[in-house]
Amino acid sequence: MKVVLITGMSGSGKDTLAELLALYLDDKNLNVWIQHNADPVKYMANVYFDVDNYKTNEGKKIMMGITDLMYSIDAYYFEKLNMKKVPKDTDVLIIPDWRYLNTRYYFEGKEENEVYTVMVQRTNARDYSVEVKRKEERLLSNLEPLIVINNDGTIIDLEHTAENLANYVALDLTAKKV
């Protein structure tokens, strides 16, 4: 299975890129599945902390705290949990909210996987408190993605980038910049 891990600051366009990438890969007759690592975290935040809005400073802090706690118990907690949802016939798994090296290690540790790491950058991404931004920046600085995408253009530009990325994933080409 090919695994595309997409990271970037909040509001950088990760989900949009994932959706566009899935469309282009689907056009190549590949079975694509998008799975967010944060889905179980959002569920826990809602059930245990009554968090409905994850895009606030408080929501972000709670979600980061839950993630840190669960990863301290099991380094691959969310990866194992989420893989139960991925259909067996999946050719390409897209995770558009990659934040931790654990995720990369989990998928790279399985011989049958080919892992592609992507960072989406955007100048005017969503603005959070200094504390939340610093934690996000610290997490992202450790990831060392293979591909870096600048998303300061139009949606048409991002579509072209997604198409190029789909070709890269489908053809197993080697590149550093899309």
PLM feature spans:
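Extreme N-terminal starter segment of soluble prokaryotic enzymes
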Residues: 1-4, 115
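Conserved lysine of the Walker
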Residues: 14
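Active-site signature of alpha/beta-hydrolase-fold catalytic machinery across serine-
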Residues: 20
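Hydrophobic positions on the alpha1 helix immediately C-terminal to the Walker A/P-loop
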Residues: 17
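Small-molecule kinase domains that catalyze NTP-dependent phosphoryl transfer to phosphate-bearing small molecules
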Residues: 82, 116, 120-178
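Hydrophobic anchor at the beta1->P-loop junction of P-loop NTPases
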Residues: 6, 95
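ATP-dependent small-molecule kinase phosphotransfer cores
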Residues: 30-92, 99
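P-loop (Walker A) phosphate-binding loop of NTP-binding proteins
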Residues: 9
